[in-house]
Amino acid sequence: MKKMMAVLVATGLSASLLCSCGQKAAMEGTTGNGSSAETKKAEEKKEGKEVTLKVFDSMAYGIESYDELIKKFEEQHPGVKVEIQHAANDGNTILQSRVNSGDIPDVFLNEPGAGAKLYYEYSYDWSKDKDLLSKFNEDALNLTKTDEGAIYGLPWTYETMALIYNKDVFDKAGIKELPNSVEELGEICKTLKSNGVQPISLPGKEKWVLGQLATHFIMDKSLDAEGTVEALKSGKKTFKDLPHWDNFFKFLDLVKEYDGDKAVETGWEPAENAVATGEAAMLHMGDWAQANFTKMGPDTKLAFMPVPVGTAAEDNTILSSVGWVFQVYKDSPNLELAKEYCEYVLCSEDGAKWMTEGVDAVPANNTTELQPTGDLPQDAQKYIKAGKTNGWIHTICDTTYSDTVGPLIQGYLLGEYSKEDVTQGFEDYFKNLK
């Protein structure tokens, strides 16, 4: 998900007439008090009331096509106005503030894991909506499934992250092999620099990017994501025990050498633009950015480079998970409409077109044959099918992860913190993780 912008955008999308009673039949996966919901709609139609559905998310990609999708939903639901707030920077803080003030959105998005769990007590349990649940891949649904069997969120799309490189730039520089160590990556950087290309454009201004980057070097593949986090929380492992942690600082030293202080000044959009236009060769990002890359450089050929965290190909990491889950406020006055909205966005053909064309991502549903066309999601599928991906650590951590570790990494890049300072900061974070 990722996903982050430096602005808060609120858009209200409206239609004019009244809510159609016949729409429910088309949404066969919707359950609940159908007759009472239809009666309410009929009464509102007589009274000329407009229903406002409040939606909150932290998206930064595919926004324009999402707005078009919402307009279609409104057209199919006369009398319904979807009021959506895109809070792509500090989304967790803004959503928490709304919840604390009693202004809870009807539908809200969170990253699966710690982010979504914060709102389970407010969330509708989908576990009895069997027809709807059958439309999603089981592995994706399990991300919000509790030990008791409750399901508090519906999955959006799969997202994969690693280093992303411009294939044309690599070809022009004569680079034919991807690196299997930080040292080999350093040699590639030298070659790129000698060809007049900035080797790495790291969005170091973004704490979330830095936090995600660090997880590649935290990952212990023998434990996968959950096992690694649990071992660090319990004290069974320390950062000195992690097989590739020291190489994280070798990687950051490359960034310091080839990107300098500029790294902590660069946001996600300028970094993506630099790689899309060939000004830079690599950055750390996910396939959620494919639509932006396509817009910035329509003919640019991109691919994933598994992060060379160790000394051999089998050590390399590429991390994949579901980016966002849709949660519905269980006490929403528009509960059935909110459920219909989620099903429409996530399972309809219109929704599938948005996910595969507007965002260029792989849907977590099993109801469409549509697939993304971009280089990155297609490349990601190869790694996923080959079993060469690991899960996400940052979403298992609590929502303070990026805000805690991001400044530590920025401080190292600026020469303000030592390797020992940063490592101690990470140690303290995981020891205090609940």
Predicted regions span which residues?
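Short, low-complexity disordered leader/linker segments with a strong preference
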Residues: 1-53, 75, 428-434
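Extracytoplasmic/periplasmic substrate-binding proteins
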Residues: 56, 115, 250-333
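Extracytoplasmic/periplasmic substrate-recognition and gating elements
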Residues: 71-76, 81, 149-150, 173, ...
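Extracytoplasmic "Venus flytrap"/periplasmic binding protein-like
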Residues: 72-139, 168-180, 281-282, 303, ...
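C-terminal capping/gating helix-and-loop segments adjacent to ligand/active sites or protein-protein/ligand interfaces
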Residues: 83, 232, 320, 358-369, ...
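Hinge/lid segment of periplasmic solute-binding proteins
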Residues: 111-164, 186, 192, 213, ...
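Periplasmic solute-binding protein
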Residues: 118-122, 141-178, 197, 204-233, ...
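Glycine-centered hinge/linker elements that transmit conformational signals in sensory
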Residues: 191, 233-264
